[in-house]
């Protein structure tokens, strides 16, 4: 249920600040968003998968905290990121 290596590499190339950047806030949020979007399709088929739903909620909360941190520290990068990811419509 996780992303494969190609998808991860694509996200790292698009959102990373440099090559091999896996720890920046933008990359972490982008990876979490991709995993969350992937799991949403899973839950359309498996409505009663509560074990995975707990993991989804954990990812959503982690992403929320990372976005709050980015907004507090670097608002311009925050605005660019949510526009790129299509969050907060």
UniProtKB/Swiss-Prot annotation:
InterPro entries: Ribosomal_uS15, Ribosomal_uS15_bac-type, uS15_NS1_RNA-bd_sf. Disulfide bonds: none annotated. Keywords: Ribonucleoprotein, Ribosomal protein, RNA-binding, rRNA-binding. One of its GO terms (biological process) is translation. CDD domains: Ribosomal_S15p_S13e. One of its GO terms (molecular function) is structural constituent of ribosome. GO terms for cellular component: cytosolic small ribosomal subunit. Part of the 30S ribosomal subunit. Forms a bridge to the 50S subunit in the 70S ribosome, contacting the 23S rRNA. Belongs to the universal ribosomal protein uS15 family. NCBIfam families: S15_bact (TIGR00952). One of the primary rRNA binding proteins, it binds directly to 16S rRNA where it helps nucleate assembly of the platform of the 30S subunit by binding and bridging several RNA helices of the 16S rRNA. Forms an intersubunit bridge (bridge B4) with the 23S rRNA of the 50S subunit in the ribosome. This is Small ribosomal subunit protein uS15.
